[in-house]
Amino acid sequence: YLDYAHTPDSLSAILSTVQELNPSQIFLVFGCGGDRDKTKRAPMGAVAEKLADKVFLTSDNPRYEDQMSIFSDIMADVTHKDKFVIEPDRETAIRQALLFSHEGDYVVIAGKGHETTQSKNGIEYPFSDRAIARNYLQLGAIV
């Protein structure tokens, strides 16, 4: 599932909806945008910890902000850090989540939704969660 969820409430909503489908496990790929509301980061980490089985924490338009600082903010209130994999490269995080998943599992890729760029240090790089996920899924076997 791809979703634009970028607030604690929207992340909770998509993960709760996926839980209603009775998945074996939920794998979540998400991050928080840089140079944006820092107060939502720790609550988003808490939602991810509560509602996902494994979380692949990654970049989501870091803009001019240090990505590791964003990760630190997200992880501030997390108590089960073993549920989290920190992977700054978003494509790699998506690939890892798909690689970890098996039949009956759901992978939720949240935060960017329809966006087709990744903003970093003033540069807009072409980037589409949808295209990347589709590419890996079409391979049939992820290598």
Model-flagged regions — what are they?
Residues 1-143:
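ATP-dependent carboxylate-amine ligase
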